[in-house]
Amino acid sequence: MKNGKVLTATIADIHIGKKSTEALRKELEEGFLTYIEQEKENLDLVVIAGDYFDRVIRFNEPAGILALDLLDRLVVAAEDGGFLLRILQGTKSHENNQLDVFNGVEESKPHLLKIIRKVTKETLNLGGQSRQILYLPEEYPSDPDSYYADYFSDHYDLVYGHGMTDIVGFSFSDWKDEGENISLGTPVHATKTLLELSEGPIIFGHIHNKKEYRGKFYYTGSYSRYAFDSQEPKGWLETELDVDDFSTYTVTFHENKLAPTYGVIMVDNLPLEEGTDLLDVLQTMMDSYDYAKIISADDNNLKLIRQLAEGSNEIKVQTAKKLETERVDSKFNFILENKLSTEETIQKYLDLTEPEADHLSLEVIGMLINPTKGYDYDDVLDQLNRDKVVVD
């Protein structure tokens, strides 16, 4: 406890093995682990809300050693300070059952550490009082409503989870960044339901940009930064709760100030004076970033930029033409989503690509794509006339 309040810390989406292990180790040691060491005697509960790992790793490679070292540091701090440690399973394709490597630690320290692999209720003594906690690790039940029914009929003091919710589940921009994918069968939790379940805050991992909803639901965001479209500050959450009333709390975001910076430079928009050396300007600008994406539509500029980027993993070159193509292509996502009938898909495609042409009805399109049903040319013409479509 701190100042008579229950103190918790939540970190998520560490993604060990995704990028530079050396850099991530430094970010953890000078950020989150320093905080844990300073607050260990005040903390009551520390939660890792999923995606501890990013990929399958070998535990004799640097990423594997970091994974072991991080847990060891947290367990030692928990023993010294007396706080509890909980680790939630994250996305299957990231964790790859590798949390099992910590089973021995969990078995030897059951009073400190629990790894949560399936939906779980737990009663904890926090601040001298029994508190009900609900954990929602990422799972893939065939019937989510039935699977969670018993758990969602109860009431809790705190909820921790990893996965999709309806405040982000239907917004492509919220989960497309940094290579995150929606796994088949992933349930999308209703935020309204979660808000009604809990007296205190609901804190989730999975979405890499931190979010707050109605002052009660939170995504921590990823601990570090991994992509150009994730510019928000990175870090972890601290929660202080009134010992007698968990509906009274303060959530504080702690920034990982060493998270790498990703900058996008639009070359064609730069106010360059005649005679200015473009490469000198770009080099100066790139000194402000750890990673830079340089975009231009000018072929001569692109040749120069590619010379600058040659052999570098920190510089990405992209043509403005490609960006325009991506914007156009996104209009046709409905084809891949496969939610419309064949006739409706064709109709929508024609309306988008030939906006000046006459609108074809579903009946006409059906006749054209189903000749085996006995429609002939006159049938199609008759339908076109009924639709008042002019035929040359």
What annotation goes with each model-predicted range?
Residues 1-69, 147, 151-155, 370, ...:
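N-terminal active-site segment of His-dependent metallophosphoesterases
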Residues 13, 46, 51, 67, ...:
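Divalent metal-coordination and catalytic microenvironments
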Residues 15-19, 54-57, 86-102, 122, ...:
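Active-site environment of divalent metal-dependent phosphoester hydrolases
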Residues 76-85, 197-200:
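A short helix->loop->beta-strand "cap" motif at the edges of active sites that frequently abuts
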Residues 86-188:
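Conserved catalytic scaffold of divalent metal-dependent phosphoesterases
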